[in-house]
Amino acid sequence: MSAELNVPMDPSAPACPEPGHKGMDYRDWVRRSYLELVTSNHHSVQALSWRKLYLSRAKLKASSRTSALLSGFAMVAMVEVQLETKYQYPQPLLIAFSACTTVLVAVHLFALLISTCILPNVEAVSNIHNLNSISESPHERMHPYIELAWGFSTVLGILLFLAEVVLLCWIKFLPVDAKDQPGSHSHTGWQAALVSTIIMVPVGLIFVVFTIHFYRSLVRHKTERHNREIEELHKLKVQLDGHERSLQVV
């Protein structure tokens, strides 16, 4: 080691290669710069893939929890609701309640099925601490199904749940005091059901407006992020083209 440190050096030779010098030193610098750019781009692509993986896993978890909760509530509501046998319910009300409950349970069970089938495979890959294991995850190929489960669980499923609550209020409160005032729409039960409907309609409208606004904001964010990525790729291309022209000059 001491012999290596005591080797005399030519003062005319540079201590380290600089990009301004011609010859092999300049080519080595260009090659090293090219490898650094390619490596950084490769890591950026892997980071984007892992970000998509974690986003898909979060969506599947939220979809499964929401679907299990709301479908269970709908089933309990249908089983536990007690119809007044002495009261003649309007036929459209019973048909609407039955159809809404069935569609609600079917939609949430379908979303739960998708989440249950895909989530274990995504979890298995996300728990492996290896950057190259991202290619084994099915989240890219199953992306349409993940978005479908997310939409069914959070958008369509919640709208059906709000309609279920309104119909349940009508079935529960409509027979109240109906015997004292037959054929009248001013008894206590009818007024209670009407109040629940009046409250739930603006809530549903607010939910729809918020969903549209959130979706547009999310699309705008993704568009801006993709534009930044395109600009970075363009800068990378310009740098690589400049290095290639420099090599041709050399």
Curated annotation (Swiss-Prot):
Molecular functions (GO terms): store-operated calcium channel activity
Complex and partners: Oligomerizes in homomeric and heteromeric ORAI complexes. Native CRAC channels most likely consist of hexameric ORAI heteromers, implying that diverse ORAI1, ORAI2 and ORAI3 subunit combinations with distinct biophysical properties can operate in a cell-type specific way. Interacts with STIM1; this regulates channel activity. Interacts with CRACR2A/EFCAB4B.
Superkingdom assignment: Eukaryota
Membrane topology: Multi-pass membrane protein
Family annotation (InterPro entries): CRAC_channel, Orai_sf
PANTHER family linked to this entry: CALCIUM RELEASE-ACTIVATED CALCIUM CHANNEL PROTEIN 1, PROTEIN ORAI-2
Known regulation of activity: CRAC channels are regulated by fast Ca(2+)-dependent inactivation (FCDI), a mechanism that limits Ca(2+) influx and cell toxicity. ORAI2 channels display prominent FCDI. Inhibited by lanthanides such as Gd(3+) ions.
Transmembrane segments: 66-83, 94-114, 148-168, 192-212
Organism for this UniProt entry: Mus musculus (Mouse)
Pfam families: Orai-1
Gene: Orai2
Reactions it catalyzes: Ca(2+)(in) = Ca(2+)(out)
Stretches assigned to coiled coil: none
Function: Pore-forming subunit of inward rectifying Ca(2+) release-activated Ca(2+) (CRAC) channels. Assembles with ORAI1 and ORAI3 to form hexameric CRAC channels that mediate Ca(2+) influx upon depletion of endoplasmic reticulum Ca(2+) store and channel activation by Ca(2+) sensor STIM1, a process known as store-operated Ca(2+) entry (SOCE). Various pore subunit combinations may account for distinct CRAC channel spatiotemporal and cell-type specific dynamics.
Database matches in Gene3D superfamilies: Calcium release-activated calcium channel protein Orai
Keyword Transport in annotation: yes
Family from the record: Belongs to the Orai family.
Protein name: Protein orai-2
One Gene Ontology term from the biological process aspect of the record: store-operated calcium entry
